Amino acid sequence: MRHRHGLRKLNRTSSHRLAMLRNMSNSLIEHEVIKTTLPKAKELRKVVEPLITLGKKPSLANRRLAFNRLRDRDSVTKLFEVLGPRYATRPGGYLRVLKFGFRVGDNAPMALVELLDRPEVEEVEVQEAE
């Protein structure tokens, strides 16, 4: 029986899986939107949402817990100074996983993972040099 085994192995060793999810978490916190495969995106959601919940309560203990999981000072700083206050009133569901077609090489289902309530990026018009 496969009851209560809520982890996708993603065809990796445990150390590789931990490192991959840590790198993807740091990338998502830094860029606020990333493109990856659908199973990885669903696992990433289980990692990042509790981290953002930690970021809503800025205590030293929570900072240390977040640093223990992320191992990146810049990501932890952004988590507590930008993302925590942004989602202070939201009771969960900080990420959106959108299906994004299939990869060209192996037809793997792709997904776009983004943080909700991102500030809109204004497009900068490039003036041509005359």
From Swiss-Prot:
GO terms for biological process: translation. GO terms for cellular component: cytosolic large ribosomal subunit. The keyword Ribonucleoprotein applies. Keywords: Ribonucleoprotein, Ribosomal protein. One of its GO terms (molecular function) is structural constituent of ribosome. Transmembrane segments: none annotated. NCBIfam families: L17. Belongs to the bacterial ribosomal protein bL17 family. Part of the 50S ribosomal subunit. Contacts protein L32. This is Large ribosomal subunit protein bL17. It comes from Paraburkholderia xenovorans (strain LB400).
